[in-house]
Amino acid sequence: MALGVKMESNPSAKSQILKTANKLFLADGYQATTLRKIALESGVNYGSLTFLFKNKELIVCELIGLVINCQYETVNILLSNRKSDKILHYAVETVLQLSIAESSEHLREMYNVSYSMPNSSKVVYDNVAKKLQYIFSDYLTDFEIKDFYELEIALGGVMRSFLAIPCDMYFTFDRKITRFLETVLLICRVPDSTIKEIISLVKTFDFDMLVKATMDGLQSYIESKI
């Protein structure tokens, strides 16, 4: 028990576990990565690791929360001169998420896991529900926070579907952006004219560059937040 208390108060061990898990999930995939391999690669005792994280889902749960926040900061920097354009922020951030999944099948797997498992999906929904209230309250004037939580369950289903299906020569990334944004913004009662404007603006950004900036910064972001 003393070891457990020590580990719980040792953020460096937790940070090392998360950084190592992130590298292994990206290199080998979520399913192929075991807790023992994470312990071995991180240099953290297996018993200490399982005290902090009882299973892989809890690790990916925390990682996805960090990735979501890292995405948000990337977009905040990109749109620092357009802070008042809340819908554009939402559109760029969600398309960035699609781009990250499109950049690697192992990243796609991590996102699919995060939207399908109970603990990690709750992190996603809780994290996003308050943002939805801030972004779309002008269009959803009768909604309370519980309504936005339920809305995020619906939007999460849309996101999961678009994440899961890879692009090909017919379903190009350009078409994925259009269909995704049309769907989610219509659900949020955004006017058609605004949707068209947002889609045109979003397509002007270099998402390959944004994906690289987000993923390159994730390891240092983990260190700074834990």
Residue ranges of predicted features:
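C-terminal peripheral helix-coil segments that are non-catalytic and often amphipathic
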Residues: Q133-D142, D168-I226
